[in-house]
Amino acid sequence: MKRHRASSGKRGETADGGRVKRPTKSHNQQGPTSQKRGTVGKGDKRAQKRKLVTQAVRREDEEHEDSSSAGEKGHSKKVKLSSAKVESWQPLSESSRKFLESVMDSGILSILCQQSKGKEDVQKHLNLLKERVLRVFKTLKVPLGKLSNLNNVLSFQVAQKQMLEMNETALVQLQEEINEAEKSAERTEETILRLQHDIQVLKSQLEEEEKKARKLCREGDTKELHLPELPKCSLQAPTLQEEILMVKNQKGLLEDMNTIQQSADMRNMLTFIEKIYEKVDLV
């Protein structure tokens, strides 16, 4: 009985060195050969699982090393692809193309918001580039395993729509600022035109004044004064001496004249006349 128990304990060991629980009375009826076959099958499955896991880990490590080395070398490493892998690639989906188009639109709007001059030329150039890229996307084939980052296209589109709305509001504000700047530029241009007209009028007036001044200078050089002619009545009128002789009370007239000459008003007038003569001589 003791030997039988020892041999049954050895039979309970599996191929990978593990132990199996002792069977119950109901399982003992099947016999020792069926127990051995069950333990061997379980060990093979576990070994296969370990092998698959190790292969998957190695594959992931190799892909990580390839991607890291390509990033360090500036994506200069060439990866050889088999024809079977390339044939399994499929064209880019419509949702992915729409998402990429929305990304390009938001990028174009952000560039135009930052641009201060030549916006029309920049916009035309960017739109041409976008059309060329979209044409390439229609025939572009991509691997299926590399599209995991585009699974959440809807959420990305919502975010891009929000960004587009923000860019549109910024464009509206920018357009209002442009309109205000155009109005101020028009007002400035009107002011400039009015000032130019005033300058032309002042120039014409200055030319007329210069002509008059040159004419007076020429007349001053000849030392001839073009004075208006005296009226004939002034030439035919009697002189002051004749009028004085015609006065009967000449003695009283002389006294009045002496009084006038000695008065302060008369002296001031004589001084004024002398100064006028001095200035005329200087001219």
UniProtKB/Swiss-Prot annotation:
Keywords: Centromere, Chromosome, Coiled coil, Nucleus. One of its GO terms (cellular component) is chromosome, centromeric region. One of its GO terms (biological process) is positive regulation of protein localization to kinetochore. Its main location: nucleus. Residues 159-224 form a coiled coil. Residues 10-19 have a biased composition (Basic and acidic residues). The keyword Coiled coil applies. It is found in: Nucleus; Chromosome, Centromere. Belongs to the CENP-Q/OKP1 family. This is Centromere protein Q. The lineage of its organism: Eukaryota, Metazoa, Chordata, Craniata, Vertebrata. The gene is CENPQ.
